[in-house]
Amino acid sequence: MSKAQTLSAADRAKLEALIGHDFAEKERLDRALTHASARTEKGSNYERLEFLGDRVLGLCIAELLFRTFGTAGEGELSVRLNQLVSAETCAAVADELNLHLYIRTGADVKKLTGKRMMNVRADVVESLIAAIYLDGGLEVARRFILRYWQGRAVRADGAKRDAKTELQEWSHAKFGVTPIYRVDERSGPDHDPRFRVTVEVAGIKPESGVERSKRAAEQVAATKMLEREGIWQQSPAGN
């Protein structure tokens, strides 16, 4: 197993307080914060944590939305879910936890900026969720997720509007055409892919979105076009 760097006692106590869980196996937290790029042995262990954390997050958010929005249909719930488990939201949680102070990355990753660095922060949050789940169980992981996602779920008013549906209605009314979506690129490992999707509406400039599923990337691209054309107000940061 790749060896993770060890947090200081002070840093560990501070971070455990933010997480709301004291780790019984301290190395789990260290491993979760040590990105694959900082390990001497590259490979599956860190990616397995991301994989598990992504599934635990998805389950807890799906349950939260199901209970919170009792009259919402599957389409609305899916839009909200995609927004709340997106790389942008996970990275925002990482920032709220000040994980940049604790994440260990390789030299190459330290040079990354923008979207790529956001994805690293999102990956670490997923790994952290897996570590919490493995150390404390599902209820402890759920408590952590509710602590940092429940407010976002309630604030995400824009998610109740399906961007693709609204863009289609607008483009039909204005241009008499249906938006066309195409997948430009698929990257990343099988367990954590990234899709770049472009939406085109005849007569105006196209827009693109990058997300972890084609459906979510389509929503991002449609949202960008709606905001650019003044149909929607630009989403506030953090939502």
From Swiss-Prot:
SMART domains: DSRM (SM00358), RIBOc (SM00535). The lineage of its organism: Bacteria, Pseudomonadati, Pseudomonadota, Alphaproteobacteria, Hyphomicrobiales. Its cofactor is Mg(2+). Mg(2+) binds at residues 50, 123, 126. GO terms for molecular function: double-stranded RNA binding; metal ion binding; ribonuclease III activity; rRNA binding. It comes from Rhizobium etli (strain ATCC 51251 / DSM 11541 / JCM 21823 / NBRC 15573 / CFN 42). Residues 162-231 form the DRBM domain. Its main location: cytoplasm. SUPFAM superfamilies: dsRNA-binding domain-like, RNase III domain-like. This is Ribonuclease 3. Keywords: Cytoplasm, Endonuclease, Hydrolase, Magnesium, Metal-binding, mRNA processing, Nuclease, RNA-binding, rRNA processing, rRNA-binding, tRNA processing. Homodimer. Digests double-stranded RNA. Involved in the processing of primary rRNA transcript to yield the immediate precursors to the large and small rRNAs (23S and 16S). Processes some mRNAs, and tRNAs when they are encoded in the rRNA operon. Processes pre-crRNA and tracrRNA of type II CRISPR loci if present in the organism. GO terms for biological process: mRNA processing; regulation of gene expression; rRNA processing; tRNA processing. It is found in: Cytoplasm.
